[in-house]
Amino acid sequence: MGQPRFSRPVHPAAAAEEVDHPPSDAGMGVDVLESGDTTPPTKRKSKFSGFGKIFKPWKWRKKKSSDKFKETSEVLERKISMRKPREELVKRGVLLEDPEQALSSDCPGKEGSVLRKSIILISHFRDAETPGQSEDDGGRLLYLQFQNLLLREGKEAAWPWHQAECIPVEQQVPPLGIKLTRGLFPSAGKSQGRAAEHPGLGLTSCVLLSTSILSAPANVSAGAFLVSFLSLVCNCSEALRAPGGEAVTLLTDTXEVTNQAQPPCQTAPCPPHPIPTNRNSSSVIAELSQAINSGTGLSKPSPPLPPKRGLLPTNPPEAALPSKPPGDRTVTASRPTLLPMHVAPTYPPPSPSPPLPTHIPPEPPRMPLPNSTPALDAPRSLDLPKETPPPSKDFRSLEVSKRTAEQGFGEPPGLPRLPQIPLHIRIQQALASPLPVTPPADGSHRAHSLLFENDGFGEDNGTLGRTRSLPVTIEMLKVPDDEEEEEEDQEEEQNSGPRVYIGDVPSITVIPMLVPQVLPEEQEGEEGMSDSDSEGPILYKDDEEDEEEDESHNSTLANKVKRKDTLAIKLGNTTTVQEEKIVFPRKSKEEWNEIRQQIGTTLIRRLSQRPTAEELEQRNILQPKNEADRQAEKREIKRRLTRKLSQRPTVAELQARKILRFNEYVEVTDAQDYDRRADKPWTKLTPADKAAIRKELNEFKSCEMEVHEESKQFTRYHRP
């Protein structure tokens, strides 16, 4: 069973510590993994221990450790106890032989040249280990192939497998004439600590390759060195398997990329990239792809982050992108390019929403809305097609995106046309107008309508399709059946006094109408009465009475005016109405007899359904009529009772028959007859009354029942 090989940064202090302390797993504490010291630490009394007394239901209990946690800790402890000693690890090349020498960066004349010992950790998993193959055969094979690749390029390998001496800068320059800048691998050092080891997944071997990354003044692309190394990894990818059994392929078409002309890196040193937090076997690959972000388009980028809130993703035009050689263009057509860091990355928008335009059209000036005359603004919108006030920014951007998705950017968006307002809504707007209604100057009874009233639009704008002012005619409410009696009503209006015919002639009582006679238009015009001041009814008549006589115009304004005037007249005439006597119309004797007969038959029919007197007496509903009869009934009842009582045996007879037994000391005395009824019924007893009754019973049983001394233990007392 192959043991996992742990690789760590080549700092000597850290390496010395890691020999004694193994790496801890992601979810476990370090003290669990220590096999030597298993005693738990002493528990101190917490300063918040008093909270448990306050919050009684929620006690602070220690969580039980799960069985899975215990099993994994036991497995780890067993594996740690089977660790190889330090000398064997040094022989295999996992650890450096002399870690103190690795710290010395004071080479003659090259102070500060060594930046970092970069560790590239390539962990691979095998489905089944080949028998006869040692644990580090894969690592040796990988190193030998890398050494052969460097020799084929014409350079000797500048860094040995075990050595960490300070090598001169000329020998440490990587092959293919590459100068590595300082900011090339910013995340290499961080990734050393983040490489997650999974001991239970069959990790068989690791390759530890330490390379010295040096700072050099020349601006040469770093892609060729990585290509040469990664092509070596791709050659060995048949032996390298992922945990699921899939081959780890770092890059495809490596030979095609190596043939390209590498352009010099023209961008500034990149800032450190964020390190991916997922701890899987592809973390190193993601870091390698991030390291060559600035100059090359070799690897696939990680999925794009969502854009920050409030920023619009702007697609840079194609002309603004840096020009590439034709070899690069063939690669970028098949793979997405990695832009330099100073260029904002273009995030692909979600598929259902259309792309937002980069240029928002300027906002048209907002027109102030007059609040004083809402009734006058409504008809203006009918006459002239105005521009609607601009919507809010969010709504406008949504509308712009919708229009651009439908008709493109070239076509101007059409102005929305206002719908025609129906007539009844315009009438309601005119009636709800806060402006005072002024009568026309000609004195006619025509309702002054504000429907098509305008301030600045007169007859000049007649060509714009304006209609003339709509006359609203208001008449009194009229029932069609009353047209025949119109003449009689007019005569009755003239003689408004009540008329009663005395005698055998049937009398007709005329109740006066509450509406006085209407003045003609000419007389009202001479007297100068206004519509609001006139006490009579306001009868608005149109000039064309004959045509509109059949139609009754019952609008809300007519009902309002009619209600107001009739209420005022009624309130003024209340006293006269109360003083008038209600006179019933006289009828003949025959009619009265018929009415009486009808009432009698209905009463007889209803009375026949009533129970008789005998039935009511049997039900004890109807009492006997006379008081003497009641007294006689009482006497009869008393006589029956006395006869029954007289037939009772006497006390002597009962003693002789030994039914009654009297002791000698018992005295029979005559007691006064008293009322045995309680003060109140038992249903209305309060708790205090019940307590008093219980107390009285207990006192009686304890004091006055001395006769039953023998059975006193059986006496049942009531609770107090």
Curated annotation (Swiss-Prot):
A GO MF term: protein phosphatase activator activity
Gene3D superfamilies linked to this entry: 6.10.140.1750, 6.10.140.2130
GO CC annotation, single: cytoplasm
Residue ranges, compositional bias (Basic residues): 637-646
Pro residues bias spans: 346-368
Chief localization: cytoplasm
Compositionally biased residues, Acidic residues: 481-494, 521-534, 542-551
SMART domains listed in its UniProt record: RPEL (SM00707)
Cleavable signal peptide: none
Keywords from the named record: Actin-binding, Cell projection, Cytoplasm, Developmental protein, Neurogenesis, Repeat
Stretch list, region Disordered: 1-48, 294-417, 454-568, 610-648
Cellular compartments annotated: Cytoplasm; Cell projection, Lamellipodium
Compositional bias per record (Basic and acidic residues), positions renumbered to this chain: 393-405, 626-636
GO BP term, example: enteric nervous system development
Start and stop residues of the RPEL repeats: 74-99, 601-626, 639-664
Function statement: Regulator of protein phosphatase 1 (PP1) required for neural tube and optic fissure closure, and enteric neural crest cell (ENCCs) migration during development. Acts as an activator of PP1. During neural tube closure, localizes to the ventral neural tube and activates PP1, leading to down-regulate cell proliferation within cranial neural tissue and the neural retina. Also acts as a regulator of migration of enteric neural crest cells (ENCCs) by activating PP1, leading to repression of the integrin signaling through the RHO/ROCK pathway.
Record note on quaternary structure: Binds PPP1CA and actin.
Family to which this protein belongs: Belongs to the phosphatase and actin regulator family.
Protein name according to UniProt: Phosphatase and actin regulator 4
Organism: Gallus gallus (Chicken)
